[in-house]
């Protein structure tokens, strides 16, 4: 029986319950989406992802589900389906967002292993989770978004994994996606020392979603034919964790 930590947020409890079912395998990913929808309603929240249209996706009419369920080489934004059945050995990313009764948003994700997974998969998931923890340690007033980025990137380098290029965390509050961007890797100008973007100082009360995404081989990605699912190019698997934190 799943025992939930009372210190978990509403969203973390929802994701933990869905994850407990997902790791058993044998069910379609659409079942996990329906479960998330039911739990969100029970907690008197609203699904943040359903109908959400991020920058560059205006022509798609909004995301069609409550939860993103991405398998193996899929990184994020996988659309739940009756045809996608979780199998032994799958690496499953569960990403969900809610709008709470007070009007604030929350965003979170976890990666679960179904059955007997490879040593690489286990190490990748452990590394990505540790990167999240390293990033959270830097999420303090007076620090910058670059401090979080460097902490996440250092874990990937330590463990020999690739950071998924071009994606990362974000500010969150009365909107799902807000400034600042929390990158998972530092990008520098031609001199190799000057960051491409200016650091943003973290201030007390600011809420940010930190979300490392690592790949077992290369970090280059493409969008699948469905217009949403982000896939690793050249094979391999990916892991993704996310937590919304308040700066103190």
Residue ranges with predicted function:
Residues 1-248:
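Active-site neighborhoods and metal-handling regions in enzymes and metal-associated proteins
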């Amino acid at each position: 029986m799943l025992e939930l930590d009372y210190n978990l947020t509403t969203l973390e409890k929802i994701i933990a319950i869905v994850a407990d079912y997902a790791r058993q395998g044998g069910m379609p990913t659409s079942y996990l989406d329906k479960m998330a929808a039911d739990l969100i309603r029970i907690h008197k929240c609203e699904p943040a992802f359903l109908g959400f249209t991020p920058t560059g996706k205006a022509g798609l009419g909004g995301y069609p589900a409550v939860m993103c369920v991405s398998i193996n080489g899929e990184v994020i934004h996988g659309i739940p389906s009756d045809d996608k059945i979780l199998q032994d050995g799958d690496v499953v990313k569960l990403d969900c967002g809610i709008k709470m009764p007070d009007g604030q948003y929350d965003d979170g994700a976890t990666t679960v292993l179904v059955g007997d997974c490879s040593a690489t998969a286990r190490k990748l998931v452990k590394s990505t989770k540790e990167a999240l923890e390293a990033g959270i340690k830097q999420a303090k007033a007076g620090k910058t978004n670059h401090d979080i980025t460097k902490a996440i990137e250092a874990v990937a380098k330590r463990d020999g994994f690739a950071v998924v290029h071009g994606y990362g965390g974000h500010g969150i509050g009365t909107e799902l996606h807000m400034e600042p961007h929390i990158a998972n890797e530092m990008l520098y100008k031609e001199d190799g020392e000057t960051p491409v973007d200016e650091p943003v100082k973290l201030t007390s009360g600011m809420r940010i979603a930190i979300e490392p995404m690592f790949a077992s081989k290369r970090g280059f990605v493409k969008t699948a034919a469905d217009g949403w699912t982000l896939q690793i190019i050249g094979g391999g698997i990916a892991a993704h964790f996310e937590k919304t934190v308040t700066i103190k």
